[in-house]
């Protein structure tokens, strides 16, 4: 038998994306097979030469002279009226929780989106529960053994 890990990564924070559209993505990921080992979200990066960067410039969400860095993917470069940078960072942080926990737990996860004491405390609690319940691979394990 072969050992492998499968991941379902998403990109959030594209031009004009809203919280509701991000939850469409979350609900799509929730329907994927149970044997997906990990889910996550990365925040959209407006790389030069891409049509979405051109759209973001046209809409005034980014200036043409702004350069997208590979080293800073934890926050959005876009300044959009549809969703704030802080909300995007919070959603990216808890994306995996939304995809795995039952919907009845979503009010707790919403608290964990925040970067204040209450949010950090809730994230620590839910993160431990997530690891204990949903992690199927051991970090650093050699998948080739």
What kind of region is each of these model predictions?
Residues 1-50, 94-110:
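Conserved C-terminal portion of the radical SAM core fold
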Residues 50-56, 61-145:
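Radical SAM enzyme core and accessory elements
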């Amino acid at each position: 038998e072969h050992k492998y890990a499968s991941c379902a990564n998403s990109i959030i924070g594209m031009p004009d994306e809203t919280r509701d559209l991000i939850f469409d993505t979350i609900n799509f990921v929730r329907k994927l097979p149970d044997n997906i080992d990990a889910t996550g979200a990365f925040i959209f990066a407006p790389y030069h030469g891409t049509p979405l960067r051109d759209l973001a410039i046209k809409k005034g969400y980014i200036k043409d002279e702004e350069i997208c860095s590979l080293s800073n993917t934890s926050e959005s470069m876009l300044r959009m009226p549809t969703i704030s940078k802080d909300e995007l960072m919070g959603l990216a942080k808890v994306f995996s929780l939304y995809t795995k926990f039952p919907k009845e737990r979503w009010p707790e996860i919403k608290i964990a989106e925040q970067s204040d004491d209450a949010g950090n405390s809730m994230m620590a609690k839910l993160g431990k529960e997530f690891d204990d319940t949903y992690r199927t691979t051991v970090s650093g394990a050699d998948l080739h053994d």
